[in-house]
Amino acid sequence: MSMNHIRPWRNIERRKSRQIHVGNVPVGGDAPIAVQTMTNTLTTDIKGTIAQVQAAADAGADIVRVSVPDEASARALKEIVRESPVPIVADIHFHYKRGIEAAEAGAACLRINPGNIGDEKRVAEVIKAARDHNCSIRIGVNAGSLEKHLLEKYGEPCPDAMVESGLDHIKILQDHDFHEFKISVKASDVFMSAAAYQMLADATDAPIHLGITEAGGLMSGTIKSAIGLGQLLWMGIGDTLRVSLSADPVEEVKVGFEILKSLGLRHRGVNIISCPSCARQGFDVIKTVETLEERLEHIKTPMSLSIIGCVVNGPGEALMTDVGFTGGGAGSGMVYLAGKASHKMSNDQMIDHIVEEVEKKAAALDAQAAEDMKAAE
């Protein structure tokens, strides 16, 4: 149960936005913040792309974007959409006809880039295809591909130019009576992105897709995204997000959920709270946590686990978690269940035992949730 009524410093008031749908996934309004990723396979490698989409979905992705750079990719998209367990967004640049073909292939959403999609006449044809095939649209502004006239006006990529680009294209869609759209204003610079998104949030009620584009590798990109997206989410801005990493798309999904979990905006799987370890540790905390992260990946039920090396903070942290283990002496530690000290367990048997306790707790929570749902019917 949420305790935010007595912890007002944890409350995040989300910006009010219109709700649209990307396939069967609601975006905006009071819908959960959707986690997205993007495949990095050749789209024409249908088998490989479907496998990557499935892996991302298994990791929790709500929506997956697929690049459609040519006609062959548009043809391949039809089978990818058919086999995908989640809605597919077609990533469209330069060639507006690819957007039309992607809509015909069954894409749930078309991402268009104002900087290279072409004039209003071409956009109008994409809008018609989207409407005809029940497709939403994302206006995806990028600092690295702004329209020439905006670069001339502002002298360089900047938040004002990005937001102006986005609002200009919102007007085009609205002038054609098309309202199933979301918008993003991405840059690789955290400051520019954050400023642009704040301006955008004040200027429109459209659902906002968050991202720091070209953020970097797994470590550097995670840090940049956590800072950039984290502050915006804390302000209540954002209806969907993608963490852009030069890494496996599954890692993007994991990082996205960790950012949301850290702010209490979405909960999926086991939230492990662990200490950095020091000379006081009663067991090898680092190796234990690494092993538990791997062995508990199959748990989707939201729950918490504390793994603390000694009694300085261990008992206190365990009070706030579903399952906990605190290191002690003589090769054993204390297991905590529902915040209370339960029983001792030897260090060499602890990992297997913790996995068992977490699985039992997850099963109990799932059963309770099913019972509550049945009672509410």
Swiss-Prot record:
Keyword terms of this UniProt record: 4Fe-4S, Iron, Iron-sulfur, Isoprene biosynthesis, Metal-binding, Oxidoreductase
Any one biological process term the GO annotation gives: isopentenyl diphosphate biosynthetic process, methylerythritol 4-phosphate pathway
Catalytically driven reaction(s): (2E)-4-hydroxy-3-methylbut-2-enyl diphosphate + oxidized [flavodoxin] + H2O + 2 H(+) = 2-C-methyl-D-erythritol 2,4-cyclic diphosphate + reduced [flavodoxin]
Residues that hold [4Fe-4S] cluster according to the record: C275, C278, C310, E317
Keyword Oxidoreductase: yes
UniProt EC number: 1.17.7.3
Cofactor: [4Fe-4S] cluster
Pathway named in the protein's UniProt entry: Isoprenoid biosynthesis; isopentenyl diphosphate biosynthesis via DXP pathway; isopentenyl diphosphate from 1-deoxy-D-xylulose 5-phosphate: step 5/6
One MF annotation (Gene Ontology) recorded for this entry: iron ion binding
InterPro entries: Dihydropteroate_synth-like_sf, IspG_bac, IspG_bac-typ, NO2/SO3_Rdtase_4Fe4S_sf
Keyword Metal-binding: yes
Record Gene3D superfamilies: Dihydropteroate synthase-like, Sulfite Reductase Hemoprotein, domain 1
Coiled coil: none
The record's free-text note on cofactor binding: Binds 1 [4Fe-4S] cluster.
Function: Converts 2C-methyl-D-erythritol 2,4-cyclodiphosphate (ME-2,4cPP) into 1-hydroxy-2-methyl-2-(E)-butenyl 4-diphosphate.
Family from the record: Belongs to the IspG family.
NCBIfam families cross-referenced by the UniProt entry: ispG_gcpE, PRK00366.1
Descriptive protein name: 4-hydroxy-3-methylbut-2-en-1-yl diphosphate synthase (flavodoxin)
